[in-house]
């Protein structure tokens, strides 16, 4: 009976020592800096452009394409739903007219 109490006390002491060591390591850790991304906005809504046509400007087309010539999603481009659909249709039209490749070689 006496041995069990001593063992329990020893275990409690070791647990307390471990928790103190953990607290010390937690204090050494530096907090991550708060990082806020700039809110993405629809370029076309900002300038009030309703019709999207990329036939004249090939550099504007490449802004909405990935390195593998795929159409970038809304979360990357920042377009609203309506303008993203217009961009996708304009890019498909540009592909059909052979202004943009279907896939990157």
Curated annotation (Swiss-Prot):
Which is a Gene Ontology cellular component entry for this protein? cytosolic small ribosomal subunit
User: Which species is this record about?
Assistant: Mycoplasma genitalium (strain ATCC 33530 / DSM 19775 / NCTC 10195 / G37)
Ranges for the region named Disordered are 1-34
Q: Which UniProt keywords apply?
A: Ribonucleoprotein, Ribosomal protein, RNA-binding, rRNA-binding
Give an example GO molecular function. structural constituent of ribosome
Q: Name one GO biological process term.
A: translation
Name of protein: Small ribosomal subunit protein bS18
Q: Tell me the InterPro entries matching this sequence.
A: Ribosomal_bS18 (IPR001648), Ribosomal_bS18_CS (IPR018275), Ribosomal_bS18_sf (IPR036870)
Q: Which domain of life is it from?
A: Bacteria
Q: Which family does it belong to?
A: Belongs to the bacterial ribosomal protein bS18 family.
Polar residues compositional bias, start-end: 9-23
For this protein, the record's Gene3D superfamilies field holds: Ribosomal protein S18 (4.10.640.10)
Q: Which gene encodes it?
A: rpsR
Oligomeric form and interacting partners: Part of the 30S ribosomal subunit. Forms a tight heterodimer with protein bS6.
Q: What the protein does? A: Binds as a heterodimer with protein bS6 to the central domain of the 16S rRNA, where it helps stabilize the platform of the 30S subunit.
């Amino acid at each position: 009976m006496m041995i069990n109490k001593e063992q329990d006390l020893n275990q409690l002491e070791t647990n307390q020592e471990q928790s103190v060591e953990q607290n010390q390591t937690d204090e050494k850790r530096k907090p991550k800096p708060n990082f806020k991304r700039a809110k993405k906005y629809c370029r076309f809504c900002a300038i009030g452009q309703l019709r999207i046509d990329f036939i004249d400007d090939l550099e504007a087309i490449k802004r909405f394409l990935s390195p593998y010539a795929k159409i970038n999603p809304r979360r990357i481009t920042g377009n609203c739903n309506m303008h993203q659909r217009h961009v996708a249709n304009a890019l498909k039209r540009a592909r059909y007219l052979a202004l943009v490749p279907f896939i990157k070689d």
